[in-house]
From Swiss-Prot:
The gene is leuB. One of its GO terms (molecular function) is 3-isopropylmalate dehydrogenase activity. It catalyses: (2R,3S)-3-isopropylmalate + NAD(+) = 4-methyl-2-oxopentanoate + CO2 + NADH. This is 3-isopropylmalate dehydrogenase. The record marks 129, 179 as: Important for catalysis. It comes from Corynebacterium aurimucosum (strain ATCC 700975 / DSM 44827 / CIP 107346 / CN-1) (Corynebacterium nigricans).
Amino acid sequence: MKLAVIGGDGIGPEVTAEALKVLRAVRQDVEVTDYDLGARRYLRNGELLSDADFASLREHDAILLGAIGAPGEVPPGVLERGLLLKMRFALDHHVNLRPSKLYPTSTSPLANPGDIDFVVVREGTEGLYCGNGGTLREGTEHEVASEVSQNTRFGVERVVRDAFQRAMGRRKHVTLVHKTNVLVNAGGLWQRTVNEVAQEFPEVTVDYNHIDAATIYMVTDPARYDVIVTDNLFGDILTDLAGAVTGGIGLAASGNIDASGANPSMFEPVHGSAPDIAGKGIADPTAAILSAAMLLRHLGDEENAVRIEEAVAADVSARGDAQARTTEIGDRIAAALSA
């Protein structure tokens, strides 16, 4: 298994090291290539992502990312557009996958959260994030700024189909989240596509929520959800709320996936680089470890993905609110898997 590893910035290298430790506890065939990508490289020489980097990344089975970002040192948007989004578009990571699960001992801000266990399938290469927009008469009182939400039948259908396929392995329920009553063109395309693809999956029940209603239900009744499918912007917002109701983004893993398998998919914890605690050895690597489990599942190793997830669940339950150092958590989970 050839992995490209981008430790990145802040706590990224620390949590990624623990994820690799756990991966090696279940797989003896892990070959790693480290990549110096992120704010450190940009601040050192102004480079973000070269053609040579892309060519090399494509030679791997998957990519494991730690965190990217240096708030206050790099202007907003530079790393996001020049590195993360560039990689997403070039490697066709059209499925952004975000599982949300409330562990028994995790603290939810909800009084009665119920049994929360759902995934959000977010479209990753279209919508408002595709870079279709611009400004006119900038700096004047007549300035005009526009961002165009681009939605194609091809792009929408492949993500919707992915959501239905995932639902078949879960509780067989898909909820489309959009704003079809206002965004009638894009929303209409999404709704028609869901209706048509649903005919191929008669065992899967289908529901629809407006995005504003979905934010309410995610707080009042999150257990209603199994698989949510939505566009780029709505998915970005909704998944952060999902992280909050399940105990915070410290346990939130994600995958940026090319479902066709033509390019290596990338897996990462949702949290940022957290430069304020970098180097202190107190960052929680759990989300990075769960991202490694997602990576294995994507590559077809369901058995070891489940083993890691079960070991994480046991460790989270045992630790409760007790604080542990980054390496201690990785050591415990790796030891449990090696026993």
